[in-house]
Amino acid sequence: VMPESIKMTTFTNLKVHQLVNLERAMLANGRFGGHIVAGHVDGTGRIINREQTDNAIIFTVEAPKSVMDYVIYKGSITIDGISLTIMRRTDSSFSVSIIPHTLGETILGSAHIGTEVNLETDIAGRYIRHFMNLGSEPTEEKPKKSMQSLLVENGFI
């Protein structure tokens, strides 16, 4: 495991014989049934609630602002490599609903309140945010400007 991966993930806390979730990469000519996952962990979160609702388990995960900036209602997030849909969001946490099959086939089945998890946000959102901020990095000669202020200055808004 690369040093950057150790720094950004829960791997530092892994114990001998502890399970991890591994999934094969999607083939380029296969059915696209989820969101684009690069396998690059953006940060970690902590499960703060786990509740059964009918046939689903609802997990609520607390995450740092650096991750929450990319978490949107009905958007996608990967928890320990498992692609899921966000059903609720607050400033510091989000919730996902997991079906029994997913719980049985992944390490989330043994996750409990307090479990630290790896999080990866949707790569499309990361690219959009990056491109929206291009040219707005502050320098001595040029103070930081938002994309909105640039659009207004140039007559687009």
Residue ranges and their predicted role:
Residues 1-157:
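Conserved loop->alpha-helix
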